[in-house]
Amino acid sequence: MKRKTFTLTLIAMMLCLPLAAQMSSADMFAHRYGDKWLRLRMHRDHSYTAGVAIKGQSSVGTTQVGDLTALGEQWCLVGTPEAFKMYNRATGKGQALAVSETSEGATATMVKARKATLWTLVDKGGAYAIVPVEGTRLSLNAFGGKGFDLKLYTADDEGGWWSPEAVGRKTVTLSVKVDGKGWEPKPRIAEMNMSVGGMRSSTRITGDLSKQTYYFPEGATRFSLHSITYRGYTFVGFEHGKGNLVASITDAELTDKLHIKAHYAPNDWRTLYYTPDAKGFPYRIPAIATAPNGHIFAISDNRPCYMDIGYGEVDIKCRISTDHGESWSDEFFVADGKGGDTNVMTTGFGDAAIVADSESNRLLVMMVCGRTVCWNGRWTPAKTATDNAVNRVARVYATYNESTRAWEWTEPVEVTNDIYPLFLDAKGQPTVSSLFIGSGKICQSRVVKKGDYYRLYCSVWTRDGGNRVIYSDDFGGSWTVLGTVADRPAPSGDEPKVEELPDGTVVLSSRKGAGRYFNLFTFKDNTFTAGTWGVAASSNDVPDGLSFGANSTNGEIMLVRAIRKADGVKCDLMLQSVPAGNGRRDVAIYYKEMTYNADGTNLYTPITFSQGWAKGIQVSDRGSAYSTMAMQKDGRVGFLYEEEPGGYCIVYAPLTIEEITSGAYAVAP
């Protein structure tokens, strides 16, 4: 297949930088441009360096995250400690650093070398201040960290103290080969972590053609190299010297002008949302659904405020696949938050829960909205549409237009006052003051149909007595509490999900540390209007109960029809996704073969439902968190989850039942 060579784009950072012994001033200076190169590491925070960035028509001195590949972070100091000019490797010998005046706040820029400032070095005992010869009271200062201009400030401030480090002659040049064609034109392929001594530099591999060179500190003799690969690509190995490809390079000898080639191959997983995005914003909170026409919807928060609803602008984005997850549309807004807009409801939208109607090409997306953090919500019947103290709820519909072959989306409509009043007690007093619907998959019944639609079930987080469940028989137009207002199906539950058993019994699965809270609602009769909740079971406290690492994280529960491959018998499998690790990492899918009474009715209690789970596929081998899933029309499970690098990207994985169960089961036809 065709091979492509990709560049290592200059998006990199150095971490954990140990400070070497102070470099003597005599060793820092060159007689002419290019004789000697230095990195100037910020003494107060060694991960930052002094560098040069192009801003408009000017090259400006800036504070940068240290990068072993960056020419703009290498300086040549020509002269003596008492009077020298500062040349930068990226701008060449024709320019040097200057300030237009020696006053506080003056910005350092690159100018013609003959007009550049003469600088002098001031020893600060373990570091140096760099000050203009004409005024030794002010020094070059980092002024706030990454991306901030270098400016003059008092030489007594440690933000203007620098620790020089000589750049050696030994280099490593890295190139990348991808066997085959990826699914998008400019993908992120990997984050390449280079370590030398105690220094680590992470560089992003993207889709531009070229090579990248690493410049190591003087005296470096050993190095390590490791690829953190974005999903959608498989890391094949490093070509290093002679012999077979290797998975990583650890403590290898650093020789002069070493060349390494990294090999990758595309696969059928997809990173749908990269964190950070082009504007530096993160993505979080996945939701996924499959419509009757086979279209798959992958939804995520995009967070310009960098945090949850209540802290500013949050948007909900969507991508659609029409070919079972092979390719995806560009992302678009389902709900566009306005940030500081005067309309409280439109400040932000997030934590989407989605369902595609099983019979019509119609979607419902429920979401939290507004500008209140959930823990601070204070709803009462008297609260108005402009009150900040309410954690609000909104709804969006989408319908497929057969003529245009396009999905038509409504604007978000606030339904706060359709939901909260459901939880008023007999005296008209609120039993819930703050709530949101658990993100991910809204459960649609396979059993209960009243009118045009099969019933929907939504599980609800509240700050008042844990979880509740509500249902709708008109596809989200109106809602009813499942059970009674007094019911507390999971009093200590966090973010919840629901699923339905074949007899109509409703299963609640709620987030908790090291396990799940499980409970079941049993209907009184086949009118499916009244029934009772059991007592919630903490699965990791039950003998043989579902348990995993010490983390508390949102996950998904889903029932699928399967075939037991050992004997070909059809059965139901319950799937539960959650991180398996200690902390938010190693997202996995657990499964449980379901059994029923002879008449097909439920035989489980919350305790027995908690038992008998097996660990299936471990989807992730790194930091990973929230997850959700939906059946696709091709019989695979569309699995959408959060995973490193970059905080959390949103990753789509099409999984077969065989993969999930290590070959024990297959999907039923």
State the predicted function of each range:
Residues 22-169:
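Lectin-like carbohydrate-binding module/patch detector with strong preference for beta-trefoil
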Residues 169-171, 176-178, 228, 247-266:
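Conserved "repeat-terminator" motif of extracellular CCP/Sushi domains
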Residues 150-169, 260-264, 653-669:
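A recurrent domain-boundary module in secreted/ectodomain proteins
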Residues 220-248:
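Surface-exposed interfaces of beta-sheet-rich extracellular modules
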Residues 9-18:
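Bacterial N-terminal signal peptides
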Residues 170-217, 243-245:
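Extracellular, modular beta-sheet/disulfide-rich ectodomains of secreted and cell-surface proteins
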Residues 1-9:
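Bacterial N-terminal signal peptides that target proteins for export
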Residues 267-669:
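Asp-box/BNR beta-propeller blade signature and adjacent active/binding-site loops
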